[in-house]
Every structure is written in C-alpha cells, then in structure tokens.
Amino acid sequence: MFSRDVRLETYDPELAKAIAAEAGRQEDHVELIASENYCSPLVMEAQGSQLTNKYAEGYPGKRYYGGCEFVDIAEQLAIERIKQVFGADYANVQPHSGSQANQAVYLALLQPGDTILGMSLAHGGHLTHGAKVNVSGKLFNAVQYGVNEQGLIDYDEVQRLATEHKPKMVVAGFSAYSQKIDWARFRAIADSVGAYLFVDMAHIAGLVAAGVYPSPMEHAHVVTSTTHKTLRGPRGGIIVAKGASEELQKKLQSIVFPGIQGGPLMHVIAAKAVAFKEALEPAFKTYQQQVVKNAQAMANTLIARGYKIVSGGTENHLMLVDMIGRDVSGKDAEAALGKAHITVNKNSVPNDPRSPFVTSGLRLGTPAITTRGYQEQDSIDLANWIADVLDAPTDEAVLAKVRDAVTAQCKRYPVYG
C-alpha cells in the first residue's frame, strides 16, 4: 500500500533536489538547443499516469496480455491522431525513440550489407543516417552525401552517388540543415536506381504538421520522426507512411514488435496522443509560424553582427553558426554562453578543421523560446546578446551583463508559470 502523504523531497531528497534544480534551470536559462522543447502540462500529466504500470506487448486488439482494453484506447487515439496530423494511412506509435524508429525501417526493408545513401553527419545529417560509429554504418554499406560551397544539399552529387553505388535506400533528413529539402527530387533520385526513399523528419515534424515546411508524405516510401523537438510531445518516436503497400506495413509492424522492441511504453504513448491532439489545434500552426519567424530574426541579426550562418540563413527552426577562422571554438562558445544562461550546443560545420568534440560551430534553434512566447524582437535581442558573448567570451563583465538581461527576459516569459 502506497502512502500519498510521503513526498519525493522527503523520501529521496538527493533526487528531489536535482529535479528541482533542473526545473529552475529551465525557467531561468534560455533554451536554444534545436532538438529541445517544453511539452505541455497535459502531456506530462498523461506521461505520469497509471499507464506506466501496464504491459501491453502487441498492438491494439492483438495483445499478449490481458487487461489491455483501456491502453488500447490510448494507443488507438495516438494512431488516428498522428495519421490526421500528417495525412498518413499507416502509423506506428510504439518506437521508444527516433533512433529506434530509424533502426526499424532499416531492418524491415534491408539486409545487412545493403548499401544506403544518407547525409554525412559532418554536413548536417544524423548519426543514424550511416555514420560509421552508429549501427546504421556498421550493419550497412553507408555512402554519404553532403552540401556544396553554399551550404546547400548538392542534388547532383546525390544523383551521381546513387548512380554509382546503386543503394537499396536513399535517406533524406537532417539534424543540422537550415533550408528546405526538395523531397520530389530525392524521390526521383531514389526511383532512378530502384531504391526506397526513407525520410527522417524528426527536426521539422512540427513545421510539416502545421504546413510551414514542405511535407515528405507524398514522396517517401516511409517517414520517421521523434515526437519531441518541434512536435512538442514526450520523448519518443513514430513511423508513418502514405500509400504504403500492405506488405510494407506488415514488415514495419513486425519489426517494431516483436523484432526490436517488447512491451511498448503505454504512458508515453498516452502522452503522444495528447501532443498529437495539440498539433491539430489552430494555435499549433500559429506557434510553428512564429518558430520560423524567430529563427530568421536571429539568423539575420547574427549575420548583421558579422557571423556566418551556414547556407546564408534559415527556412526552418534552426541555424548553424560557422566560426571557422575565429579564435573561439564551438566548445568554448558553448561554455561561455552557458555562463550567461544561454544554452546551446557546439556543432561541427561543413569542412570543419576541429574535432567533433571541439568543433567550429554552434547550432541554435527556436522551438523552446517560441513555446515561452518569444516574438521577433525578443529573438533579435537574444541574438545580439549571443554576439556580445561570442565577441568577448572570456570577459566576465560582458557575461554578467548578458546573464542579467537573459534572466530578466526569462522572467517575462515563464515556461510553466
């Protein structure tokens, strides 16, 4: 019998202190990591529910355990809602993460040793798109494409590599690319060599849902995403498709369970269902439009302050600041900005001479600040403060001045009130 009178801060003060400190950090630091966001209290309520107790191996109506009639409702709601969000006719909401969703796609459609063609991590791709340190680069023969001197995807190079290497799968998507992707061009390249087109839209799923970024659904054989980032839900993954054959759907279903996962996380799936409902609200489109406006305001301000943005600007929620040739590294810049209560992540940029542990770049994103309520002028102010720190990363007076300004700005825009 559990006592409702015992509080976490009494039972486990060490952990409670860490949780409280993190809650405080999220309130008084500005969050510019492009892959992070704040989910709603409703999402957190669902994720903290009694559904965390329930095992439910299988799928709605086809479980290997009894007592699943209510979690079936939760999962079916998530499935139907995400189909509506993206105009899909197939959806699997069970992947525990975006990386596991990607792994499921590879294992469902490929054999070990098959060739895949994906974007280089060093040029803005993701670990799971064929990086040698990832299972996708170990199980499969991964060929990588990149960006040109303008920082744009070189579609001619993608076509040349596809023609030369005859991949079984072409992977489109990114973790650090700030322009729109020509999904139709990617599909034409894949079709030219008889390959699957697999799109990982983890970073831009919320923008796609709101119609402010082109949708890959009409072009890709299969699409994956995380459910956090711009989609603003709990941490997790999904697989969706439009026009997928029954055979393809069966392969995807069986590889998620029982192929690579056992029991799904029903409390997380319930939280996904809440987030997907939120994504169908008119306010969600307004939010995503503001995400892009804020990103463009930040990028333009940094350019005006003399900083190079890879590709020259942004058409989505993120930007890469290229500091090749500057004395400050990405690692040092991240640390200096952190002292000023601005949270970012160091990031490699194309042709980066520094190691991935040091880097010559910063990745900045606006989903989290936009959730707080930031508008363009707030983003311009923030970009100027970032430039102030980057101009003088060891000047304690500058860091203190910016920290005070950031703290005041955060108080105007509380996350949870």
Curated annotation (Swiss-Prot):
Homodimer. NCBIfam families: PRK00011.1. One of its GO terms (molecular function) is glycine hydroxymethyltransferase activity. The modification N6-(pyridoxal phosphate)lysine is found at residue 229. SUPFAM superfamilies: PLP-dependent transferases. It catalyses: (6R)-5,10-methylene-5,6,7,8-tetrahydrofolate + glycine + H2O = (6S)-5,6,7,8-tetrahydrofolate + L-serine. It is found in: Cytoplasm. Its main location: cytoplasm. This is Serine hydroxymethyltransferase. Its cofactor is pyridoxal 5'-phosphate. Coiled coil: none annotated. Catalyzes the reversible interconversion of serine and glycine with tetrahydrofolate (THF) serving as the one-carbon carrier. This reaction serves as the major source of one-carbon groups required for the biosynthesis of purines, thymidylate, methionine, and other important biomolecules. Also exhibits THF-independent aldolase activity toward beta-hydroxyamino acids, producing glycine and aldehydes, via a retro-aldol mechanism. Pathway: One-carbon metabolism; tetrahydrofolate interconversion; Amino-acid biosynthesis; glycine biosynthesis; glycine from L-serine: step 1/1. Keywords: Amino-acid biosynthesis, Cytoplasm, One-carbon metabolism, Pyridoxal phosphate, Transferase. Belongs to the SHMT family. The record marks 228 as: Plays an important role in substrate specificity. It comes from Xanthomonas axonopodis pv. citri (strain 306). (6S)-5,6,7,8-tetrahydrofolate binds at residues 121, 125-127, 355-357. InterPro entries: PyrdxlP-dep_Trfase (IPR015424), PyrdxlP-dep_Trfase_major (IPR015421), PyrdxlP-dep_Trfase_small (IPR015422), Ser_HO-MeTrfase (IPR001085), Ser_HO-MeTrfase-like (IPR049943), Ser_HO-MeTrfase_PLP_BS (IPR019798), SHMT-like_dom (IPR039429). Its EC number is 2.1.2.1. GO terms for biological process: glycine biosynthetic process from serine; tetrahydrofolate interconversion. GO terms for cellular component: cytosol.
